[in-house]
């Protein structure tokens, strides 16, 4: 469960999941995902990590809808028998998205078009907490800290603190700061280029969310000042734990899913 929680955290910290579906991410991989730039966190999602969560959600959905009589394992076995073996026999036997969806519905006996529309072709958040619950697992954000920040990422470049990413909708983005700007000072105090991310966080910790600060930057050798309203730079840290009020049926479902006894 720890590994699943890590994947959930990796996906939930990316803003691109609201912009790009995993179907689009897969299609655009060679022209976008493997050619990342400063706007990548705002625009793209990994079809590897989020794709694994969609597969998890599909597995749990099938298990719930069939009383644990069917799972994603049954779907994968059917795909192998109908298509996979032909590949190793030297036969070209591809499969379309529509055919794959039809097999999933056939094996599970469930109507899953809404699932496909929302989570494969859409950017709707996966209701993982809701799906985990019948398996006796609770999903909670353990990070309750309120941290004032600019919603940027910085790195050291020579003696400069350079802004590498500006997260869309964040404090710096609303103020007008851009990726590539050299961050000089906050309220007249120099931002050190020595371990800049840590030092910037420490410098901003003196403030509260909602306070205004003056950020000074160089943009192509032009000195610029921006008034920034600090926002809560919350980084989720989801954890998965066994539910305190689990029932015997929840425990049984979890054991069938994880294929282990407790």
Predicted features by range, described:
Residues 2-262:
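C-terminal recognition in membrane/secretory proteostasis and scaffolding
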């Amino acid at each position: 469960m720890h590994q699943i929680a890590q994947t959930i955290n990796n996906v939930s910290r990316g803003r691109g999941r609201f912009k790009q579906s995993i179907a689009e991410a897969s299609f655009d991989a060679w022209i976008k995902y493997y050619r990342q730039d400063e706007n990548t966190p705002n625009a793209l999602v990994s079809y590897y990590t989020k794709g694994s969560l969609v597969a998890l959600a599909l597995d749990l959905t099938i298990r719930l809808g069939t009383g644990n009589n069917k799972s994603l394992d049954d779907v994968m076995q059917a795909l192998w028998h109908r298509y996979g073996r032909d590949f190793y026999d030297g036969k070209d036997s591809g499969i379309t998205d529509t055919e794959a969806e039809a097999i999933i519905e056939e094996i599970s006996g469930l109507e899953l078009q809404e699932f496909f529309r929302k989570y494969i072709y859409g950017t709707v958040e996966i209701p993982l907490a809701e799906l985990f619950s019948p398996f006796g697992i609770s999903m909670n954000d353990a990070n309750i800290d309120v941290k004032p920040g600019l919603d940027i990422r910085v790195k050291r470049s020579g003696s400069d603190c350079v802004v590498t990413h500006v997260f869309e909708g964040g404090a710096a983005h609303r103020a007008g700061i851009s990726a590539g700007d050299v961050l000089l000072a906050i309220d007249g105090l120099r931002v050190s280029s020595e371990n800049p991310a840590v030092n910037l966080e420490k410098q901003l910790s003196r403030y509260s969310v909602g306070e205004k600060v003056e950020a000074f930057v160089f943009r192509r050798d032009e000195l610029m000042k921006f008034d920034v309203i600090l926002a809560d730079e919350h980084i989720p840290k989801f954890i998965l734990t066994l539910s305190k009020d689990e029932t015997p049926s929840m425990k049984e479902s979890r054991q069938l899913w994880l294929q282990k006894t407790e």
